[in-house]
Structures are given as C-alpha cells and as structure tokens.
Swiss-Prot record:
This is Period circadian protein. Residues 18-28, 56-65 have a biased composition (Polar residues). It comes from Drosophila mojavensis (Fruit fly). Phosphorylated with a circadian rhythmicity, probably by the double-time protein (dbt). Phosphorylation could be implicated in the stability of per monomer and in the formation of heterodimer per-tim. It is found in: Nucleus; Cytoplasm, Perinuclear region. Keywords: Biological rhythms, Cytoplasm, Nucleus, Phosphoprotein, Repeat. GO terms for biological process: rhythmic process. The lineage of its organism: Eukaryota, Metazoa, Ecdysozoa, Arthropoda, Hexapoda. Forms a heterodimer with timeless (TIM); the complex then translocates into the nucleus. Signal peptide: none annotated.
Length: 65
C-alpha cells in the first residue's frame, strides 16, 4: 500500500506511525487514538497525553510543508 501511492498514502503512513508511537507512550490504546484525533481532549484527559500531542503537532507542521 505504501509503495502504491507515493503522495497521499505516504502522508497517511507517516501519520499512522506517529499515532502508534504516541499510543505506546501513553500506554492506553483507547485514549491514545481518541487523543490523537482531538488534541484538546488529549490535553484535558491527562498530562501524559499532552507530551505526545506536542509531537503530533510538530509532525503535522512538517507534513504541511
């Protein structure tokens, strides 16, 4: 799938990788995925989620470039 589409699929694969790493850091799969979709919810749920939320924003800015 990754090789199939170098453009859009490439962005999705990187995004999924970031979300997976954030989930491992939070050690909560359920909250990790929901926090990834809603950054505000992640910050409100707990301090541990605020750290990966920052990394997600940084990766998103790089993807936008």
């Amino acid at each position: 799938e990754g090789s199939g589409g170098s453009g859009s699929s490439g962005n999705f694969t990187t995004g999924s990788n970031v979300r997976m790493s954030s989930v491992t850091n939070t050690s909560n799969a359920g909250t990790g995925t929901s926090a990834g979709d809603n950054s505000a919810g992640g910050n409100g749920s707990g301090n541990s989620n605020s750290a990966p939320a920052v990394t997600v924003t940084l990766t998103e800015s790089l993807l936008n470039k």
